[in-house]
């Protein structure tokens, strides 16, 4: 994951503390991130018997402006950020999603705290930059690291502090992952399939069919084993579901295995 490799890169005596503001703290702790950084929940409770809440509530009811109320959700956590702190936005492709306004709001809150902001390891569809609010937001970053040339070329025109750098995940240290002994010395190919990709298919079942053709080609034309490797394990998008379908179809070959969910260093 991007946050794992980033925290590992920043594990340096120069920094007093590395703080990860997370919407999924339990998941991050499960994968061991609490061992390399401090984890804080992004949204915190707040009192409704305050003037800021009353103002925010009025703005919602009279102007349909939900931003002031949203700010209250994040205020306690973002108040932990101080002047000249370096804040990395690590979502990668956050600006490509429907809730982009939330990230613009959070960025502005960080700037108001006096932080230096970095858009870290990002990918942005150039079409998204037709939105003037996004353009204005992107211009405010002190540094942008784009992880591929399409994003770099688009953002460089807007913010000169844009550089082209490989995704931080490529710098992630690898850890040994246990697999059945018969696979250890085999030449292997790793394959991932995501429900997120399947949801975008134009012809029902075409993605799975293409993966089946790929696996059958590998089994027929090579002596390679195949490792089915999950990447995203969310309630609404679990890679293990389509991967298990592939495994059940080809397990009798004796050359296919499913890698269980584990921390990203082992998956790598």
PLM regions: where:
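Active-site anion-handling motifs in enzyme catalytic cores
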Residues: 1-268
